[in-house]
Curated annotation (Swiss-Prot):
Family: Belongs to the SLC35F solute transporter family.
Keyword Membrane in record: yes
Protein name: Solute carrier family 35 member F2
Organism: Mus musculus (Mouse)
InterPro entries listed in its UniProt record: SLC35_F1/F2/F6, SLC35F_Transporter
Length: 375
């Protein structure tokens, strides 16, 4: 075996150092792209929404398991009433085209359909638990994400890159890990009374959520957050109130009211109200799709709280699932999607995710935000 000459050894050393420097610069570039202040802020906002959803799940489960109270429509009705009292009345005192009566005159039927989609999405998902399994609900509820992306493509004219589809796949892989952890931990102990009906309810509910979220993104970016919440509060109160009298009046009559049950209802309503109030703000600076990816962690937060409140069994797969979902969420937020305008429009294309969307740029520059005249 021949010994390496000093000349060749000296030549290989700079090449090795160059390779190390190249790898280091690549890692540094990736780190700067993935861990910017704006992406970290987006992550924090998404997890704030997840905690709101976690609060609604914990209070609902506590009502169901400890007090045998199963009234999802009543709980939703209280939330819609709060939205009505705050945002609908706010619209009533607006002037011009933003006034409540003017909005109703021009677009009442559109907001009726939006309110119906939002109310029934909430109701169908909760009702599905009576028929199918926890695993089915967790997995099939993710069906709303591809539906949301498809609706965003055609309605909002969002254009995705390969990295976005990879990120969504990674997030769904994290959900699969969470479901596997549930099965191993023994939480999947309910076979369901009619799995097919339950699965159909989940798919319908997830699809209606997607419709509601796309409409929400359009309205908060083109019109205003107050208009969306005010109209959802108005029509949600009417629709859920009617449905409440039809499907839950017997369940409500059987409730043995005390201060603990009342406190749980108040806690649920506050969590739901915060979720509805903050979600448009987050969607405005990101997108409906990124928000839905971020709140996939809500079930995991509920599981972590359930370790103490409901004596769930812990599994290391929950930590792995949380990590995988967050990796997918960061990947999605790292690259902005592109929004194409109709051919006849002279408006330049804008991005619709992260810090690059038009709404946030207007906020940062201090310019007034333009409002579209149509929904």
């Amino acid at each position: 075996m021949e010994a390496e000459s000093p000349a060749s050894a000296g030549a290989s050393e700079p090449r090795a150092l160059g390779t190390v420097d190249s790898i280091g610069s690549q890692l540094s570039r990736i780190r700067r792209k993935l861990f910017t202040w704006d992406i970290l802020k987006t992550i924090a906002l998404g997890q704030m929404l997840s905690l709101c959803i976690c609060g609604t799940a914990i209070t609902s489960q506590y009502l169901a398991e400890k007090y045998r109270v199963n009234t999802p429509m009543l709980q939703s009705f209280i939330n819609y009433c709060l939205l009505f009292l705050v945002y609908t009345l706010m619209l009533a005192f607006q002037s011009g085209s933003d006034n409540l009566l003017e909005i109703l005159r021009r677009k009442w039927w559109k907001y009726t359909l939006l309110g119906l989609a939002d109310v029934e999405a909430n109701y169908l998902i909760v009702r599905a638990y009576q028929y199918t399994t926890l695993t089915s609900v967790q997995l099939l509820d993710c069906f709303g994400i591809p539906v949301l992306m498809a609706l965003s493509w055609f309605i909002l004219r969002a254009r995705y890159k390969v990295i976005h589809f990879i990120a969504v796949f990674v997030c769904l892989l994290g959900v699969g890990t969470m479901v596997g952890a549930d099965i191993l931990a023994g939480r999947e102990d309910n076979s369901g009374s009619d799995v097919l009906i339950g699965d159909i309810l989940v798919l319908l509910g997830a699809s209606l959520y997607a419709v509601s979220n796309v409409c929400e993104e359009y309205i908060v970016k083109k019109l205003s957050r107050q208009e969306f919440l005010g109209m959802v509060g108005l029509f949600g109160t009417i629709i859920s109130g009617i449905q409440l009298l039809i499907v839950e009046y017997k369940d409500i009559a059987r409730i043995q009211w005390d201060w603990k049950i009342a406190l749980l209802f108040v806690a649920f309503a506050l969590c739901m109200f915060c979720l509805y109030s903050f979600m448009p703000l987050v969607i405005k600076v990101t997108s409906a799709t990124s928000v839905n990816l971020g709140i996939l962690t809500a079930d995991l937060y509920s599981l972590f709280f359930g370790l103490f409140l409901f004596e769930y069994k812990f599994s290391g797969l929950y930590i792995l699932s949380f990590t995988v979902i967050m990796v997918g969420f960061i990947l999605y937020c790292s690259t902005p999607t592109r929004t194409v305008e109709p051919p006849e429009s002279s408006v330049p294309p804008v991005t619709s995710i992260g810090i690059d969307n038009l709404g946030l740029k207007l906020e940062e520059s201090g310019l007034p935000e333009t409002h579209s005249a149509v929904l």
